[in-house]
Amino acid sequence: MTSPIAPLCRALAERSVRYLLIGVSGANFYIPPSWPSFVTLDYDLYLPPDANNLLRAWEACEQTGLDLWLRDEPLDRPRDVGLAEQMIARLALTRVTGPDDLTVDLALVMKGLDFETVWKERRPFIIDGAEIPQPGSGISSSRSTLPAVTRTSCFSPRIETRSSSW
């Protein structure tokens, strides 16, 4: 089965877009195939507050036939650096939708961490030929209630809870 996010990730790579897959969908890549994965309805991509990078991300989405939204309205045109700068100033989320109920959020914030810090610790995964960068072991997105996921060796990831509420 092909991952629905793979075509977009290939288009992002072609444009040298910097992003990290975070949230529940990101945590699922650390789980061994024989284990059950967490259910989620979307993919969360964390991007740096860089207008040119955001513009390239939008172009990659359009190239793969995806629609761009700001809340419940189509993202305005022209989609240029000026619009990207406005989105960054407001830390606005771009919602991306596509076939088969594909939903991707292009987020410019991750509570408690800045992009450059997380980017330095990234760990790539290869899914359907697409490299998908993710936060490295020990970095967890506080946007979700998931436990932090830590790699103990190359082939043996484990889940480590950080609070008693989980």
Describe each region flagged by the PLM.
Residues M1-W166:
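Compositionally biased terminal segments of proteins
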